[in-house]
Amino acid sequence: MHKVNYMHKVSRKIVEYMEANSLNTLFVGKNVGWKDSINLGRTNNQNFVSIPYNMLIQMLEYKCKLAGINVVIVNEAYTSKCSFLDREKISKHDNYAGRRIKRGLFISNSGIMINADINGSLNIMHLGLEKQNVKLDVLEEILRPENKRFMLNPVRLC
C-alpha cells in the first residue's frame, strides 16, 4: 500500500475513533530532528527514516479541524524516560524515578509495571494538558481499577 494512502487511512481511523468516543483533544508528540542521527543499521534506517510522520501530523490536523477536534503538538523529549506514575517532572535528570526493564515494559519507582509506550503517551498527554493550562489529576483517573488493564495491554486501533 502506498504510504500517502496508508497515512490517510490511519488519520481517518484515529479521527473516527475520537468522534465515536466523544474525544475533543488529540495530543501528538513530536521531536524536531528525531530521525536525523538515527543508527539502527542500514536496512532499518531506510525503513524507519522513510516513515512520513510530519505528513501524518498534517493529515491529523486537517481532519481533526474538520471534525472540531483540537490538536495539541507536544515536545516529547524525555517523555519515555520519566515516570508518569511517579509524577516525575518531564525533563533531563541524572537519575530517573522509573526505568525500562525490558523492551516495551516500564517499571515505576513504586514497582508498578506499565507498557513503556503507554507511559510515554501519558506523559505527552500530561504535557499537553499543562500546555492548555488544564488542571486535572489525570493520574487518579488513569489508575481507576477499570482502566488498569490498558496499562500493560494497550488496545490496537489499526
What are the language-model segments listed below?
Residues 1-158:
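Positively charged, helix-rich recognition surfaces that bind polyanionic ligands
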